[in-house]
């Protein structure tokens, strides 16, 4: 059975209260594609690795898509009304401004594909840690990986330059 059209602006207004930290992400449809609305602000330090492309449409406000491009970190600003198609296998870290709202479309993963979360040293851009996993639920599969990385001082310490990657405030008491 066909799903009726969704009035995107009305959906955002009805669910705006859910588009805030710490999650800020709601899946609105999933059938071949994962269609999400994401609200800001956020302060992600991880990079997401997806074997498929991702499509970004900035509805309100601005965001910066940090990417790892051939070993170099760079920023791609995406403003309200702009779209951007991220090619497959490009590590990226969406940085959303307060009050911003974006639509993100990803294709569902193929059975053999895995998602990844990566962290890079903010001083020298050396890869600190990478976790690959089969993605089953985009809203619940990431937090355990975040916890594992941020709770480990060893994983957050750069083997190249010795810099310690900062952990979000909620992990501040954890230095094991």
From Swiss-Prot:
Query: Binding residues for substrate, per the UniProt record?
Result: 54, 96, 106
Per UniProt, O2 binds at 44
Positions that bind Fe cation 1 = 48, 54, 92
Stored InterPro entries? 3hydroanth_dOase, RmlC-like_jellyroll, RmlC_Cupin_sf
The free-text note explaining how the cofactor binds reads: Binds 2 Fe(2+) ions per subunit.
GO BP: anthranilate metabolic process; L-tryptophan catabolic process; NAD biosynthetic process; quinolinate biosynthetic process
Please give the NCBIfam families that the UniProt record associates with this protein.
Answer: anthran_nbaC, PRK13264.1
Role played: Catalyzes the oxidative ring opening of 3-hydroxyanthranilate to 2-amino-3-carboxymuconate semialdehyde, which spontaneously cyclizes to quinolinate.
What is the official name of this protein in its record?
3-hydroxyanthranilate 3,4-dioxygenase
State the species of origin.
Answer: Xanthomonas campestris pv. campestris (strain ATCC 33913 / DSM 3586 / NCPPB 528 / LMG 568 / P 25)
